[in-house]
Amino acid sequence: MGSSHLLNKGLPLGVRPPIMNGPMHPRPLVALLDGRDCTVEMPILKDVATVAFCDAQSTQEIHEKVLNEAVGALMYHTITLTREDLEKFKALRIIVRIGSGFDNIDIKSAGDLGIAVCNVPAASVEETADSTLCHILNLYRRTTWLHQALREGTRVQSVEQIREVASGAARIRGETLGIIGLGRVGQAVALRAKAFGFNVLFYDPYLSDGIERALGLQRVSTLQDLLFHSDCVTLHCGLNEHNHHLINDFTVKQMRQGAFLVNTARGGLVDEKALAQALKEGRIRGAALDVHESEPFSFSQGPLKDAPNLICTPHAAWYSEQASIEMREEAAREIRRAITGRIPDSLKNCVNKDHLTAATHWASMDPAVVHPELNGAAYSRYPPGVVSVAPTGIPAAVEGIVPSAMSLSHGLPPVAHPPHAPSPGQTVKPEADRDHTSDQL
């Protein structure tokens, strides 16, 4: 019998037992898989769940207690869950991606196993759009390279020296920016770009007609048209099996000679080997990438290590302190809706609803009538936000989850490339929930 049939102790595939909550049951376990700061999530979940962290980068690093007992999981983009990984979780009912993108989760397999997958689609729209414009401005005005020249001791005084060090700087007004994917982030980028004087084109075959008139943009019907007419191309679509390596050796040759390329969406959209070659040959004048095929990114290895005129940042376009707190709060609220309501009906942003084979109603729970000693609390209640500490010195919320050999001196701290490239005029199918649900984060 396969492992997937053993997950639920005899229940059919895709049907998982409900979370048992209420006065006669312990609080269910919710785990943050790839982080260790739960201070934002705790106030939202502490009366309905025990919250723990794993700080793992793979399921091999997740403690057996979480694999056996966790009913909910929170995760960022730094861990990947394949079907094999998902089958290790015996009681999991919901995963919430703290961010918009969810290409690091096999959502179909999760649905087959009865696990709902949710995201935070409006997360970091402003931050990602701002970061995109920052990259575009850097490419046009060469700010990064000018700074680097001064840091390296280059003397810049005469007009000739300025011309030399600022070679390649260009005027923005009148240039054409091509946006691939006009979801939330794409629209925010378009509005900012227009304010800087760009003519803005976009390609999005799955967006309804009319948005271009409302925003004052020009729509093109094929990817080839956008690449041919754009001085700078920026990507704002999700990643799936249809658009992996959307920018490849073939599509690079369809771009204008000397165009710029910006990617703050998903690393797999760009064939980095083809990009490196295009940068070396000058077919692409400059590129700025916040996301990469292999993360964490390093200039010391991979095809981009010797590429000229390249700006790289570490998948941070989404980040601001405000955005981080907002997305964590919303992710925690989604977990709470799952525990106290019905899956998937009570969920706000379930991305694999069509794949779920069953929806189990979980009894609602009134925390006001739950006695602490019967609500999974083996220790007395503390003021809001305080986590008690077990005799071992490990916070009670994580005791038995973090291996005893690990010293904790503190509490919870504040697709394969398709065999052929897209042909001219071919539409490229994005995923159903792209960055209108995006990743950029």
Curated annotation (Swiss-Prot):
Could you say which tissues express the protein in this record? Expressed in a wide range of adult tissues.
Cite the record's Basic and acidic residues compositional bias ranges: 430-441
Q: Localized where?
A: Cytoplasm; Nucleus
Which note does the record give on the cofactor? Cofactor binding induces a conformational change.
Which segments carry the region annotation Interaction with GLIS2 2? 288-360
Which UniProt key words apply to this protein? ADP-ribosylation, Cytoplasm, Differentiation, Isopeptide bond, NAD, Nucleus, Oxidoreductase, Phosphoprotein, Repressor, Transcription, Transcription regulation, Ubl conjugation
Q: How is it modified after translation?
A: ADP-ribosylated; when cells are exposed to brefeldin A.
Phosphoserine found at: 300, 423
Any keyword Cytoplasm?
yes
* EC number in record: 1.1.1.-
Subunit (UniProt): Homo- or heterodimer. Heterodimer with CTBP2. Interacts with ELK3 (via its PXDLS motif). Interacts with RBBP8 (via its PXDLS motif). Interacts with PNN, MECOM and ZFHX1B. Interacts with ZNF366 (via PXDLS motif). Interaction with SATB1 (non-acetylated form); the interaction stabilizes its attachment to DNA and promotes transcription repression. Interacts with PRDM16; the interaction represses white adipose tissue (WAT)-specific genes expression. Interacts with GLIS2, HIPK2, FOXP1, FOXP2, HDAC4, HDAC5, HDAC9, NRIP1, WIZ and ZNF217.
Describe the task this protein carries out. Corepressor targeting diverse transcription regulators such as GLIS2 or BCL6. Has dehydrogenase activity. Involved in controlling the equilibrium between tubular and stacked structures in the Golgi complex. Functions in brown adipose tissue (BAT) differentiation.
Q: What is this protein called?
A: C-terminal-binding protein 1
